[in-house]
């Protein structure tokens, strides 16, 4: 649909809004075959829930299904789609997301709605004075959307569980590959990083049919960076 074919210049000028995520520099995170969509965009979200509903209606009646396994993040939805070389903290500064944040929290950034420089200014404010509110809000929105998905797969006779796997992109340097990292840094890194990626572990207790699953790729390598980053151990 050409309505959603928007260039970075239009996004930066404020003359059009993208259905893709936008980073701190005002660039859309568009990947292979249009990946990089913003799950907070209504059109994108409706497409997700409609597809999930179709899957559930097709397979719900066969029984014996434990639940639905979904990967969140990197290029998969719902999540903050993160291209290689970037982290979740750098993603999510589009006009729609910022307007929703301001509306939900009552916090006003008081920045212009046009011009490329507004994205870097948003990043500075939301990772500075409004850090706690920003990342708490992102985790709440992710939780709300996850609950909506869970409701879809419980709408029939057979109630499926939802298993959510955050696929977050780690920075090149972190406490599990820095020789001077402290035990405290390693003990808190995973939880802090999940919060920044919109998956605050405190919002998931596994008792309501929604389970946050630890990231377990690269586990067989058992190197200090890989093993530590996926288990929050190594101290």
Feature-to-residue mapping (PLM):
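Active-site-adjacent "subsite" loops/lids of carbohydrate-active enzymes
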Residues: 1-60, 112-135
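Aromatic- and carboxylate-enriched substrate-binding clefts and catalytic-loop regions
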Residues: 1-9, 32-33, 71-114
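Acidic, His- and aromatic-enriched active-site or binding-groove loops in soluble protein domains
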Residues: 11-30, 90-109, 181-204
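A Trp-anchored, charged/polar loop motif used as the substrate-binding/catalytic surface
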Residues: 42-57, 143-147, 188-196
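Active-site neighborhood of glycoside hydrolase catalytic domains
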Residues: 50-51, 63, 90-162
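Short loop/turn motifs at secondary-structure junctions
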Residues: 59-65, 206
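Active-site regions of oxyanion-processing enzymes, predominantly non-cytosolic
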Residues: 65-71
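Substrate-binding cleft/loops of secretory-pathway carbohydrate-active enzymes
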Residues: 74-80, 149-234
């Amino acid at each position: 649909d050409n309505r959603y074919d928007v260039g970075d210049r239009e996004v930066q000028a404020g003359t059009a809004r993208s259905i893709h995520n936008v980073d701190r520099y005002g660039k859309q995170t568009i990947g292979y075959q249009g990946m990089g969509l913003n799950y907070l965009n209504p059109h994108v979200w409706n497409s997700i829930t409609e597809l999930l509903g179709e899957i559930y209606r097709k397979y719900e009646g066969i029984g014996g299904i434990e639940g639905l396994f979904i990967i969140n993040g990197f290029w998969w939805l719902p999540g903050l789609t993160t291209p290689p070389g970037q982290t979740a903290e750098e993603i999510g500064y589009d006009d729609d997301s910022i307007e929703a944040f301001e509306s939900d929290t009552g916090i006003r950034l008081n920045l212009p709605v046009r011009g490329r420089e507004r994205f870097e200014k948003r990043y500075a404010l939301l990772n500075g004075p409004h850090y706690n509110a920003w990342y708490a809000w992102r985790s709440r929105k992710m939780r709300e959307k996850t609950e909506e998905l869970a409701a879809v797969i419980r709408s029939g006779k057979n109630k499926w569980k939802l298993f959510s796997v955050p696929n977050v992109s780690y920075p090149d340097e972190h406490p599990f590959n820095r020789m001077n990292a402290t035990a405290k840094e390693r003990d808190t890194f995973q939880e802090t990083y999940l919060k920044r990626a919109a998956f605050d572990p405190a919002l998931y207790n596994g008792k309501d049919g929604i389970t946050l699953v630890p990231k377990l790729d690269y586990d067989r390598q058992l190197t200090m960076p890989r093993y530590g980053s996926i288990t929050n151990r190594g101290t």
